[in-house]
Amino acid sequence: MKRLLFMLLATQLSSCQNKEAQNQPTEKKQTKGVQTSQTEKFKYQATGNCPVGYPVEIYRGGFESSDGGYVDLQAGTHTGIAGWGHVGGGMSTLVKTVPNRLHVQWVAYAEECVYEIDTEIDYEKMVQYFKEGYQNSGAFLNYGEYKMETYTAIVVGYAPGGAVFIWLNGSGKQVEIGRYQGKKVIIPQEEIDKLDGFEKLMLQKSECERIMNNPKIVPPDVMEANRDKSIPFDLWDSYRQKYSWRPTFIVQHDGNAFNARLNMFNAEFEGLFGESLSKNEFVKRAIPKQIQISWRDKDLQNYGGSLWFDENEIFAAFAEVYKDRPEGKAEIELRINVTNTFVTAWVIGNGKEVGINLKTKVEVFKSRLKR
């Protein structure tokens, strides 16, 4: 259902931040000299997302492709409760042409305005990622060989200030395609006049207030945390800062880690296992929001653990470690205690070591399986 909200009352509402449109694609992925016809097809779902506390809704628009294809991105109100960059509501998963353009108008409820974006997006990069796929630790072929999988969703994230982010999502990996910038628009009165009664009702300022005060859309703890605070427009761009780092694991008494998943603040995630964990190379990544690990002791008893890092604590640790050497390298060292019941974390590199344990939430469990 289209919801335009409050443009009808534009003179009564505060205007949202009006940034100049500037598209900022992620670092270009090497295409190895292969140029595509821009009509490549893959099976995927197109979905939307937003940060929690800043709900949005698509008024109209979607993905466009060079062969005339179109994928509508209207899917109701996006709440972001599942997490930034998470696969949200969208159309069915079907074989479709990979889009080369995004044209959308969306309502930013927290800002009481409408944004529009009409921009080319990185088609070549998406096609190469779709073709390359990735190895998923949960999928095996015969003889223990890991199965290659590919991405199954294109996720569009709408952040305050008109910032738009696009990711490719799969069950085992999510990668950013690019960051783009929308601009504030006013919907023409003649267009509003053609809307039906229910849609006109949705244009009232009272609807904006209802959305922002609905605990199923904006959780009460988020409402309270955001109360009387200005919108941090640059926050989601700050999440994109990348550093060269890798996780390392210390398991007591000849134990070893055999699987890890890294969930970053910029909504990218990846798995480390088998050869990728054995090599464990330094990679430019965003700062991690969560790390999940699996390990076994010398008796082949399996354990699992998750660490959720406090945003302020881990960002401060990275700032300290990379302060003098922004292009340096560091490790996030996870130390598992002797009884396999707790994990501590340290950012180590460039001659510095900073603990990130005061506010980190840790959960550890013992598996019923041995191997």
Predicted regions and their residues:
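Bacterial signal peptide processing site
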Residues: 17-19
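Activation corresponds to long, low-complexity, non-globular regions
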Residues: 152-258, 334-371
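Low-complexity, Pro/Ser/Thr- and charge-rich linker/hinge segments at domain boundaries
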Residues: 121-166, 314-329
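Hydrophilic extracytoplasmic domains
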Residues: 278-371
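Tryptophan-paired
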Residues: 59-108, 257-309
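C-terminal motif of bacterial Sec signal peptides marking the signal peptidase cleavage site
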Residues: 12-15
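Sec-dependent signal peptide recognition
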Residues: 2-7
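Extracellular ectodomain segments of secreted/surface proteins
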Residues: 22-51, 220-245
